[in-house]
């Protein structure tokens, strides 16, 4: 069994701003988001301890829609 699995991908709107992948780490029991630019280069990972996968997916969708801003990037 894999220790992590990708749950979903959210593409930024407007296009050209990259995408976010929602992952779950079964060993750590942790949901997280990996953020990528349009060149498929990962530029940030955000952990969500003690949050549901639905919460993590909502955060990724909010980023893709421009509602959620990443701090310290």
Question: What kind of feature is each model-predicted range?
Answer:
Residues 1-31:
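Short N-terminal "domain-start" leader segments
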Residues 2, 38-73:
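Mixed-charge, Lys/Arg-enriched low-complexity segments
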């Amino acid at each position: 069994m894999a220790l992590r699995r990708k749950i979903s991908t959210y593409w930024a709107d407007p296009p050209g701003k990259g995408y976010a992948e929602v992952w779950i780490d079964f060993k750590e029991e942790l949901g997280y988001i990996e953020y990528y630019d349009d060149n498929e280069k990962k530029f940030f990972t955000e952990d969500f301890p003690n949050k549901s996968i639905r919460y993590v997916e909502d955060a990724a969708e909010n980023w893709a829609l421009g509602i959620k801003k990443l701090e310290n990037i």
